Amino acid sequence: MEWNDWHAHIWRGKAATVARAVIPTGFRDLDRALPGGGWPLGALTEILADGYGIGELGLLMPALAALTKEDPAKPKKWVAWIAPPFIPYAPALQQHGVNIDRLLMIHPTSGGKNRLWAIEQAVRSGSSVGVLAWVAAADADDIILRRLQLAAEEQGCWVLLFRPANARLQRSPAALRIHLSQAQSATRVEIIKCRGGRPDVVDVAGFALDGAASQASSR
C-alpha cells in the first residue's frame, strides 16, 4: 500500500469525534481485529512482552517499510529507535523493504528520565514519522504516558513503547495496548485495550519470530 493510500485510510471509533488515520499492519487477521485495519497513527501504542525476539520486530516490518519509503513529494522524516536493547540487523531490515537510511538510532545516557525525555523530544520535533522506544515498567508513569499520547496526537506520529509484561498492571492512556507471546510457530497478539475496538487474540504467522534481531548483537 502506497503512502497516500494508507495515510488516507481512516476510521472512526465508537466514541471518536474526529477521523483517525491508521497504517495497515500487513497481516490480514490482525488488521481485521484493529479499528480501521491497522496501527493507529497520531497515538501511543504499547507493546508488552516477557522478553525480546518473540516476533515484535517482524510484526512491525510492513509498517516500517511503508513509513521509510522515499517519496519525492514529501519531506524526509525519520523513524527514531530509542534505547533498543540490540543492534538491529540491517540486511534483515532491508530484506523486508525497510529503508535503513531513514532510521535514526538514539542511545540516551543511562537513566529512565533521560530516556523518556529523548522519546518526547523525538515525537515533538516534527521530524519523526515514527518513534520506537524501549522503556522499563517503572520508568513510565501515567503522567509521562499522557504527555507522549498528547504529543503523538499533535504531531500525527506513530509512537510505540516496548515495555515488560508487568507494565500491564499499570494504567495507561495509550490508544492501543497489546501483549505478545509465542504460540507454536506464530506470535500471539493479545489486544488488551483498543480505542474504538474491543479486546481480542490473534495468532500471526508468516515471519521469523525473532525478526530483524535474529542476528543482532546485544548492547
Residue ranges and their predicted role:
Residues M1-W81, A92-D101, G197, S218-R219:
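Detector for small/aliphatic-rich hydrophobic stretches
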Residues G26, E56, Y89, R115, ...:
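Helical mechanochemical/support elements of P-loop NTPase systems and associated helical scaffolds
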Residues L30, I47, L103, V131, ...:
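Conserved RecA-like P-loop NTPase ATPase core
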Residues G51-Y52, A80, K113-W117, C157-W158, ...:
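Localized chelating/binding microdomains
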Residues G55, F86-P91, R168-L169:
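Short, charged/polar "capping" segments at the starts of alpha-helices
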Residues P75-V129, W134:
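Conserved inter-motif catalytic segment of the P-loop NTP-binding fold
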Residues P108-I178:
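P-loop NTPase motor core
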Residues V159-R219:
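Phosphate-binding/switch region of NTP-binding enzymes
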